[in-house]
């Protein structure tokens, strides 16, 4: 079984910046990987929130240099929303994969078993998140674009410029 690859085309302050390509661990965390894949394609239509179940047009709302870039809140855009393809939240699948370094793709949450659509891409090793956040993929191309997004962050997490997922899908 080959692992699916998905992409984000990023704009920063309205300017096209480049593409991030991610490989999803559907063999390790199939439910988590499928949620993210379908949110990249938008194939599931409209969610319970009334908003499309799609990352396209959403932004990285929390960017902390030397830590991570976080996005996936396509319902509210500020970190308080988001929705999975399974309904609002779904359980932690497993913690087999670890936060080993830059490019690790992991689920953001509000405690155990609260996965929705919010995710983060690590920019450094974040071992303290092991066993708390489900790792479900990694960046295979465009780590330099992740760094450009990271460069628009702040210690508070508030972005200096709008970092947008202008387009996304499956390769």
Swiss-Prot record:
<dbReference type="GO" id="GO:0016018">
    <property type="term" value="F:cyclosporin A binding"/>
</dbReference>
<comment type="similarity">
    <text>Belongs to the cyclophilin-type PPIase family.</text>
</comment>
<dbReference type="InterPro" id="IPR029000">
    <property type="entry name" value="Cyclophilin-like_dom_sf"/>
</dbReference>
<keyword id="KW-0413">Isomerase</keyword>
<dbReference type="InterPro" id="IPR002130">
    <property type="entry name" value="Cyclophilin-type_PPIase_dom"/>
</dbReference>
<keyword id="KW-0697">Rotamase</keyword>
<dbReference type="InterPro" id="IPR020892">
    <property type="entry name" value="Cyclophilin-type_PPIase_CS"/>
</dbReference>
<dbReference type="GO" id="GO:0006457">
    <property type="term" value="P:protein folding"/>
</dbReference>
<protein>
    <recommendedName>
        <fullName>Peptidyl-prolyl cis-trans isomerase 7</fullName>
        <ecNumber>5.2.1.8</ecNumber>
    </recommendedName>
</protein>
<dbReference type="InterPro" id="IPR024936">
    <property type="entry name" value="Cyclophilin-type_PPIase"/>
</dbReference>
<dbReference type="GO" id="GO:0005737">
    <property type="term" value="C:cytoplasm"/>
</dbReference>
<dbReference type="Pfam" id="PF00160">
    <property type="entry name" value="Pro_isomerase"/>
</dbReference>
<feature type="domain" description="PPIase cyclophilin-type">
    <location>
        <begin position="7"/>
        <end position="170"/>
    </location>
</feature>
<comment type="function">
    <text>PPIases accelerate the folding of proteins. It catalyzes the cis-trans isomerization of proline imidic peptide bonds in oligopeptides.</text>
</comment>
<dbReference type="GO" id="GO:0003755">
    <property type="term" value="F:peptidyl-prolyl cis-trans isomerase activity"/>
</dbReference>
């Amino acid at each position: 079984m080959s692992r699916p690859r998905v992409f984000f085309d990023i704009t920063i302050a309205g300017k096209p910046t480049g593409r991030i390509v991610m490989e999803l661990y559907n063999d390790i965390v199939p439910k988590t990987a499928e949620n993210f894949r379908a949110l990249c394609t938008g194939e599931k239509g409209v969610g319970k929130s009334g908003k499309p179940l799609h990352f396209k047009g959403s932004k990285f709302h929390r960017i902390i240099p030397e830590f991570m870039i976080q996005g996936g809140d396509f319902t509210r855009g500020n970190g308080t929303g988001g929705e999975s393809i399974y309904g609002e939240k779904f359980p932690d699948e497993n913690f087999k994969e670890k936060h080993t370094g830059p490019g690790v793709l992991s689920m953001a949450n509000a405690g155990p078993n609260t996965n929705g659509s919010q995710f983060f891409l690590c920019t450094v090793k974040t071992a303290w998140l092991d066993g708390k956040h489900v790792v479900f993929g990694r960046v295979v191309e465009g780590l330099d674009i992740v760094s450009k997004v990271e460069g628009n962050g702040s210690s508070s997490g508030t972005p200096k410029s709008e970092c947008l997922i202008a387009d996304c899908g499956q390769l």
